[in-house]
Amino acid sequence: MLTLGVNIDHVATIRQARRTVEPDPVAAAVLAEIGGADGITVHLREDRRHIQDRDVRILRQTVRTHLNLEMAPTEEMIAIALDIKPDYVTLVPEKRQEVTTEGGIDMLGNFDRFCRVVERLQAANIPVSWFIDADFAQIQAAANTGAKFIELHTGQYAEAQQESDRQALLTILKEGCEYASSLGLRVNAGHGLTYGNVYAVACLPNMEELNIGHTIISRAVLVGLERAVREMKLAMRGQL
C-alpha cells in the first residue's frame, strides 16, 4: 500500500525566521502521525537553515512510524547519520544558494565515492535511498551503488504548466518506476507534489511512498496539521 512521508522542514522554517523555539518540529511530527502520516521526513542541511541537529536527535526518540533523514553525502552528515541511526537516509544534492532542492543528484559524477557512502551507511543497518531524476542511466547507477531505494524527483512534473507536458513527464516517471523495480530497487517519489497533482503520481506502478511537505504545511496553517495530513491521504487515493 502506498504510504505518505510528511516532511516537516517548513515548520522549522517558521521557527528559524525568528530564531525562537516555536513552532517545534517535534510537536508537528506527533500531530502529523496522529493525522495518519506513515513516516516523518526531515532534511538536515549543511547550512542548518531550518531543521537543526537537536530536532533530528529528539525525533529519533519520538517518531513512532519511521524517520527518513534527507542529507547531502558529506562526511559531516554521514557521521551524524551513523550516530543517530534514522530508519533510512535519502541522499540529496545541495547548493547553498538554492531555495529548495532543484533536481536529482548526479550519480555518475561521483559514482565511486557514492558506492563507499552506501557501503558505510548500510553496514550500520541504515538503508539508503538516492534522490534522482527518472533517467535510466541515473537509476542504473543508483542500483549499482547497492542502495535499497530511490526517490524519483517529481519537481518538473509538478511545475509543468501545460497538460501535454505534464503527461509526457508522467510517462517518464512511470517508465522510471518500472525500470527501477526491474533492477530490484524500491521506489519513492517527491518534490513539488500538491493536493491537486498528487493522484497521478500515486497511481504509478510499484510506488511505495510519497514524501510531501510544503503543501501540507501550507494547508495546515489554515486547517491544522492533523486535518491537512488526512486530506493529503485522501488526495493520494483520488478522494479529495
Curated annotation (Swiss-Prot):
One GO MF term: pyridoxine 5'-phosphate synthase activity
GO CC field: cytosol
Residues of the site described as Transition state stabilizer: 151
SUPFAM superfamilies: Pyridoxine 5'-phosphate synthase
Subcellular location: Cytoplasm
Keywords carried by this UniProt record: Cytoplasm, Pyridoxine biosynthesis, Transferase
GO terms under biological process: pyridoxine biosynthetic process
Binding locations of 1-deoxy-D-xylulose 5-phosphate: 9-10, 45, 50, 100
Active site: 43, 70, 191
Classification via InterPro entries: Aldolase_TIM, PyrdxlP_synth_PdxJ, Pyridoxine-5'_phos_synth
Job description of the protein: Catalyzes the complicated ring closure reaction between the two acyclic compounds 1-deoxy-D-xylulose-5-phosphate (DXP) and 3-amino-2-oxopropyl phosphate (1-amino-acetone-3-phosphate or AAP) to form pyridoxine 5'-phosphate (PNP) and inorganic phosphate.
Name of the molecule in the record: Pyridoxine 5'-phosphate synthase
Organism: Microcystis aeruginosa (strain NIES-843 / IAM M-2473)
